[in-house]
Regions:
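Catalytic or ion-translocation cores adjacent to nucleophile or general acid/base/metal-coordination motifs
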Residues: 238, 258-261, 716, 723-727
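P-loop NTPase motor module signature
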Residues: 1-378, 490, 698, 709
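Short acidic, Pro/Gly- and aromatic-enriched capping/linker segments at domain boundaries
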Residues: 461-483, 661-686
């Protein structure tokens, strides 16, 4: 029988054993992480979901198991979805006799029944009446503890019975507890959250003592499965912490979010288990309709690397082929596989976007450890028992909440030293849970406890094994660092770690933002780190040939790098022609307007060719527009980048390219001839001058700007396009000022010319302005 939480698994096993009048571990047993009570007589085992996954990976036949019960399945944790998918695979291929039962009080059963083709069994159960009291405003997320404390006080004074209050996290619980102690001295306060020891968790859910009124301040750990006797009042903040995976950064972080309606129903139900009760909701009845009906399956926005490793260990190389209830996002699956390949847990795949990769021997060892693959990599890669023992301590510290808090110095070695000192003195206190986890890991690795002094750089080296993309190098002396994945982080200069040149970052939050103008708001915040010697880290030597947008040239360097961090750089003299060409062409695609000399001659050629293409689409003339040329630079530019055995690599050299000649040569010879015939660049006028024709795509007609006097003797409007397109004549004065526009030169000579002649003769009296144009010589002829 699967339960989503350890506390619920223990309590349910204890309750069933109590009904049978037996101790836990006989007929009824349980197995949770690092703890089990089972025997050869055990018939019913209550497990957490990760334990079942491990059982399926180790033995897909599930020998000795006849039925699997998935309890509280509405929570849709990633482990429950994975366990169900693996169990269905086992049922379909190996164990058709294996029975699967899914149980929930609030889930939409019709969808699951349809997907699994399973019958539905419904039980109304027993629920006492519960009065629901809504707030007159939604809770202020920045005043959660204060508003919860006020409502708890109100409920304590106006109602009878014990109180179960739901808060989003441990921080709010501790603050609310502090507020309540001063105003409700007669109440007994019990916190209840995942990081508490099992003993303290049992105290919180135990029945009240005679004459005692209990207030339990809980996270969603108490939302399902648990029955706390005496509770008839629930105070619900309507908030919870959700672990959100950021695929961009590869980091997961907690966000405080609104709960869904089914979660609110589960919480409310805690008040009606024993007798009638009351539920206080710190939101309005109107806003309740805006809450989502069901929570999203965790598999849709979680880090999938542990899941993918388990699937590979199960023997399936293509996770998407499993019979999922909700298919995990392909993008997150690819990211998970890429991470596992970088940790050498999966064999590399040549296609970066393919969903495949077999488990390696190292990956199989990692999959046997009940922790994230990164942590497992660190523990199995340690090269000595002392180093492995240190890795176990680091793993335990990373898995539990930091006993020193996030606002303290980020020195990881300091925490490890405190842990070892407390272990030596047998006075662990708040470090006890961490010490227990480290001990369990040492048992798995079969090594002894080590409390010797710690080498800080060894700590950094181990962290770098788990988080190779979080190796960080100082970019200045004010706490700014750049990580090997390219992201930037900031450490307060007062932090002891800020003085190091190289760090390995164990815990950070790239979502940290600030309204400060210092620029620190764009960087991540570091919680745990250790110094590291970069000389002991694997580095790669590679050629970095790229476009330098500042120098406006191809940068050619041989670099020694750790990810995005450049340790050493030397110039390269001879890079391959193909590589340089590709880089320049890509730069041209992005910023080619500033890289070449797009002068007036180039623009005139483009307009002339485009004009003919518009007149004659049947000619299929290539597109010589600037936009198209830059997009297709790889097709034409490489032929002109080499001269005398040397590549042109800078904008200075590229601007010397004769674009007119290059663009003209893109056209086949027969098209060149046809364009020259249909759209000549110049036309000869009676004066003997060759006047340039101005082609403007989209204009009324090509324009011929010419002095009026040079047209004496021209009886009709000149044309292009084999006589089909008359030119628009822009007739100019001797001072090159426009005096007339016309496409009908013959009509102009017969009419308008005489009016224009009067004005020109007045302004330019020394010039020759004949009356009989057809017989009059041109100005040049007259001078002769």
């Amino acid at each position: 029988m699967l339960e989503p939480r350890r506390l619920a698994a223990r309590q349910i096993a204890e309750r069933m054993a109590q009904i049978l009048g037996e101790p836990v571990g006989k007929t009824i047993g349980y197995r949770v992480r690092f703890e089990s009570k089972v025997s050869d007589e055990t018939r019913i085992e209550v497990l957490t979901e990760g334990i079942l996954t491990r059982m399926l990976v180790n033995d897909a036949t599930l020998e000795g198991v006849s039925c699997l019960i998935f309890d509280e399945f509405h929570e849709r944790s990633i482990n429950s979805d994975l366990a169900l998918a693996l169990a269905r695979q086992t049922q379909e291929i190996i164990r058709p006799d294996l029975k699967l039962i899914i149980m929930s009080a609030t889930i939409d059963a019709s969808i699951i029944c349809q997907t699994l083709q399973a019958p539905l069994i419904e039980s109304k159960g027993r629920m006492f009446p519960i009065e629901t009291i809504y707030a007159d405003h939604d809770i202020d997320r920045y005043q959660v503890a204060q508003e919860m404390a006020a409502t708890i006080c109100q409920a304590f004074r106006n109602q009878e019975g014990d109180i179960l209050a739901f808060l989003p996290g441990q921080g709010e619980i501790m603050k609310c507890e502090e507020l309540l102690r001063s105003v409700l001295p007669s109440a007994t306060l019990y916190p209840l959250y995942g990081n508490l020891s099992p003993e303290k968790q049992r105290l919180a859910i135990a029945p009240s003592k005679p004459g005692e009124r209990k207030i339990v301040l809980a996270t969603p750990i108490a939302e399902t499965s648990l029955t706390i006797e005496g509770v008839r009042i629930v105070v619900d903040s309507g908030l919870c912490r959700k672990l959100v995976y950021d695929a961009r950064t590869g980091l997961s972080h907690l966000e405080t979010v609104r709960i869904s309606q089914d979660m609110a129903t589960q919480r409310r139900g805690r008040a009606g288990r024993i007798t009638s009760g009351v539920c206080y909701r710190l939101w309005t009845q109107t806003s309740e309709h805006l809450m989502p009906e069901q929570r999203l399956p965790e598999i849709l926005d979680a880090d999938l690397s542990s899941m993918v490793l388990d699937i590979a260990a199960f023997g399936e190389n293509k996770p998407e082929l499993l019979p999922w209830l909700t298919l995990p996002p392909k993008g997150n699956l690819v990211l998970a596989q890429q991470l596992l390949m970088s940790l050498n847990a999966l064999t590399p795949d040549h296609d970066a976007h393919a969903l495949s990769g077999s488990i390696t021997a190292e990956g199989s060892r990692m999959a046997q450890l009940p922790c994230h693959p990164r942590i497992a990599k660190m523990m199995i890669s340690s090269d000595s028992p002392a180093s492995q023992a240190l890795a176990c301590d680091i793993a335990a510290l990373l898995e539990e909440k930091d006993p020193m808090g996030e606002n303290e110095d980020s020195d990881m070695t300091l925490r490890l030293s405190i842990l070892r000192s407390a272990r030596c003195k047998k006075n662990l206190g708040r470090w006890n849970r961490i010490a227990q986890i480290a001990q369990e890991y040492r048992k798995m690795l079969r090594i002894r406890e080590d409390n010797e002094p710690i080498d800080a750089e060894e700590v950094g080296h181990l962290i770098a094994l788990a988080y190779p993309e979080r190796i960080a190098h100082a970019t200045d002396h004010t706490g700014n660092f750049k990580m090997s994945n390219g992201n930037t982080i900031f450490i307060d200069p007062c932090d002891s770690m800020a003085a190091n040149e190289w760090l390995a970052i164990a815990s950070l939050n790239l979502a940290s933002t600030s309204s400060s103008n210092s620029g620190q708001g764009r960087k991540g915040r570091v919680f745990l780190s250790a110094p590291v010697n970069w000389k002991n880290l694997p580095a790669q030597t590679c050629e970095n040939i790229s476009w330098d947008s500042k120098a406006l040239a191809v940068k050619m360097q041989q670099e020694t790098r750790i990810g995005a961090l450049v340790i050493d750089s030397k110039p390269i003299q001879n890079a391959s022609r193909e590589t340089v060409s590709n880089i320049i062409c890509e730069a041209a695609r992005k910023d080619g307007l500033s890289m070449f000399d797009w002068n007036e001659s180039v623009h005139r050629l483009q307009q002339r060719v485009a004009q003919v293409a518009e007149w004659h689409p049947e000619l299929e003339i290539p597109d010589l527009s600037t936009e198209h040329l830059l997009t297709t630079a790889r097709a034409w530019l490489p032929f002109y980048l080499e001269e005398g055995g040397k590549m042109k690599t800078s904008v200075t050299e590229l601007k010397k390219l004769n674009l007119c000649e290059i663009l003209w040569n893109i056209l086949p010879y027969d098209l060149q001839q046809e364009i020259d015939r249909l759209a000549p660049t110049h036309i000869r006028v009676p004066s003997g001058s060759n006047i340039r024709i101005d082609y403007r795509l989209g204009a009324e007609a090509p324009v011929l700007s010419v002095r009026l006097q040079e047209c004496f003797g021209m009886t009709s409007t000149p044309t292009v396009d084999a006589g089909r397109q008359p030119l628009l004549l822009e007739l100019l004065s001797p001072g090159f000022k426009p005096v007339q526009l016309t496409q009908d030169l013959a009509s102009f000579w017969q009419g308008t010319y005489f009016e224009v002649r009067k004005e020109l003769k007045r302004r330019y009296p020394k010039h020759f302005w004949p009356c009989l144009l057809y017989t009059s010589p041109s100005p040049r002829d007259r001078q002769k």
